[in-house]
Amino acid sequence: MYKRQVLELCKEADMVFMGLHGSNGEDGKVQATFDLLGIRYTGTDYLSSAISMSKELAKKVLVPEGIPMPKGVTLHKGHKIEYVPFPCVVKPCCGGSSVGVSIAHNEKEFEEALDEAFSYEDTVLVEEFVDGREFSVAVLDGKALPVIEIEPLEGFYDYKNKYKAGSTKETCPANIPEDIASQMQFWAEKCCQAAGVTTYARVDELLDKNNNIFCLEINTLPGMTDTSLIPQE
């Protein structure tokens, strides 16, 4: 999976900065390899990385801890789902950067969304669509940073809106009541505690029209580009 010379080079470093995304980078494989070789690295360990990367596994860990998350089911390639409440969100189980994520409003869009998600992996997550505002909360050494609101100018916070400069309005601190912000920070910290995430991470959340908070996922290697969220917090 990795060229030997890359690992040899990493062994010589005092600390390896983890700037990887997607499979092998965020799912704990690199972290586990580094642990076996005694290589120090930034970010959380292999187990919490694996839990956070898998949306299916994360739900199994976070929901029993009382953390509010959208209802959803896991669907494997070739299997059918009997009932789908529209609109719904379809996403690859272990994807990142919103790649392969779609919102389906009817059966036709749902089938198209499944085809798109299954083109990336064999397991997808089908979740209820929460109509609300999007937020993100960074957690540094167990302590939540200020809440940031994400307002895409078009559509939802997909891959294009995440990485194309000027496509999304981001407000930090978010223009929300202090008690709501405190709740979001609490749930972000709770997510990281439950999944065993240390050092730093970013938790994505939604706020519906009734001020109900929903936690979406934990990003253990959040983006650090000019358009990324954590540098703004």
Predicted regions and their residues:
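ATP-binding N-terminal substructure of ATP-dependent carboxylate-amine bond-forming enzymes
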Residues: 1-47, 51-53, 57, 64, ...
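Active-site nucleotide/adenylate-binding loops and adjacent lid/helix of ATP-dependent enzymes
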Residues: 7-10, 51-133
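Short beta-strands and strand-loop turn motifs
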Residues: 18, 40-45, 71, 92-93, ...
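Glycine-rich phosphate/pyrophosphate-binding beta-alpha loops
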Residues: 22, 98, 153, 219-233
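Phosphate-binding site of ATP-dependent enzymes
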Residues: 105-186, 207-214
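Conserved metal-phosphate-binding beta-hairpin within the catalytic cores
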Residues: 128, 139, 192-224
